[in-house]
C-alpha cells in the first residue's frame, strides 16, 4: 500500500440498510470501489505491477489484453508515469470501454473476433516493439496489489466478521483473502460468482483450475472461463468458500445499492452484495461486500 500513489483513493465503507428498520444497526457495509479512480479496484494492481518492473522495461512500455477494467487501470497508471501502454481488444469489445481506455492514454489494438487471438497479438506486439507483456491472470504483483483492499477493510472496520468478494480469474479475490486471513484469520472470506460464470467455484470443487465451456451473465466483468494458476492457489488456501448468485439476484442488488446506498455499481460490482441480500451467507454477522 505504501507504494500506491496518492491518487489511489482509500474508498469508504458505506452502510446499507435493507429496510427502514435496519437503519442505525446495519449488518452490511459496502467497500465502495466503484468510487475508485477508473471506477474499479484494478488500478491498485496495475500500480503494483509497474512498481515491480525495471525502469528499462517501463521505458519501452507494457502490452496486455483486457476488455475493460484492467485496460483502464493500466492506461491510467501508464499515463501517471508516462509509460506507453498498448491494450489488445476484440473487435466486439464494448465501444464505451474502448473509449475509456483511450481516454486514459492507452493505444488500443484490435485483434478480430477470436478470443484465442488476443494473447498471440500481445506476444507479437511485445516482440516487435520490445515491450513487456503483462499476464493479468498470473502476474504475482496483481494479487499483492489487490491485498490493499483487504487491509483497508480490517483497519476501517475493527469488528468485521465476514468479507464477501467477487471472483473472476481470481486475482482480486486471492489478494483480498490472503491479506485478511494472514492478518485476522477469524474473519470469514467468501467468494461470490454468478451461477452462469462459475469457473472458480467449479475449480475449487475439482481441486484444480478447471475451464467451463461458456459463460452467460449480465455481470460480464466476472466472465473468466478459468481461474489463473497462481491466484487459484491462494483461493484454495484462503477462501472459506464460494457461493453462487442468480441473474435476478444480481439485478436486485444493483437496484438496492442505487436506492439504499445512493451509488451506482455495475452488475459485477454488485455481485458480492447480492449474496448477502439473497441470504446465500449468514446475514447476522457484520459483513463487508466489495
Regions picked out by a protein language model, each given a short descriptive name:
Residues 1-290:
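PLP-dependent amino-acid enzyme catalytic core
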Amino acid at each position: 500500500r505504501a507504494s500506491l500513489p496518492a491518487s489511489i483513493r482509500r474508498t469508504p465503507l458505506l452502510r446499507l440498510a435493507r429496510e427502514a428498520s435496519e437503519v442505525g444497526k446495519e449488518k452490511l457495509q459496502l467497500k465502495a470501489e466503484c468510487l475508485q479512480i477508473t471506477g474499479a479496484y484494478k488500478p491498485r494492481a496495475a500500480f503494483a505491477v509497474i512498481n515491480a518492473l525495471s525502469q528499462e522495461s517501463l521505458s519501452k512500455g507494457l502490452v496486455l489484453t483486457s476488455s475493460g477494467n484492467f485496460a483502464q487501470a493500466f492506461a491510467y497508471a501508464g499515463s501517471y508515469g508516462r509509460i506507453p501502454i498498448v491494450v489488445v481488444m476484440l473487435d466486439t469489445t464494448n465501444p464505451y470501454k474502448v473509449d475509456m481506455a483511450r481516454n486514459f492514454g492507452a493505444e488500443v489494438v484490435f485483434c478480430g473476433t477470436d478470443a484465442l487471438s488476443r494473447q498471440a497479438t500481445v506476444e507479437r506486439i511485445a516482440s516487435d516493439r520490445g515491450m513487456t507483456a503483462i499476464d493479468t491472470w498470473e502476474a504475482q504483483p496483481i494479487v499483492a496489489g489487490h491485498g490493499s483492499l483487504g487491509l483497508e477493510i480490517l483497519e476501517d472496520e475493527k469488528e468485521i466478521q465476514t468479507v464477501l468478494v467477487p471472483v473472476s480469474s481470481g486475482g482480486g479475490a486471492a489478494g483480498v483473502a490472503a491479506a485478511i486471513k494472514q492478518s485476522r484469520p477469524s474473519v470469514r472470506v467468501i467468494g461470490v460468482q454468478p451461477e452462469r460464470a462459475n469457473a472458480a467455484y467449479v475449480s475449487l470443487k475439482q481441486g484444480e483450475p478447471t475451464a467451463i465451456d461458456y459463460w452467460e451473465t449480465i455481470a460480464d466483468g466476472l466472465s473468466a472461463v478459468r481461474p489463473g494458476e497462481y491466484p487459484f492457489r491462494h483461493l484454495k488456501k484462503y477462501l472459506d468458500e464460494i457461493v453462487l448468485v442468480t441473474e435476478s439476484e444480481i439485478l436486485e442488488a444493483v437496484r438496492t445499492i442505487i436506492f439504499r446506498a445512493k451509488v451506482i455499481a455495475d452488475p459485477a460490482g454488485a455481485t458480492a452484495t447480492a449474496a448477502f441480500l439473497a441470504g446465500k451467507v449468514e446475514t447476522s454477522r457484520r459483513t463487508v461486500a466489495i
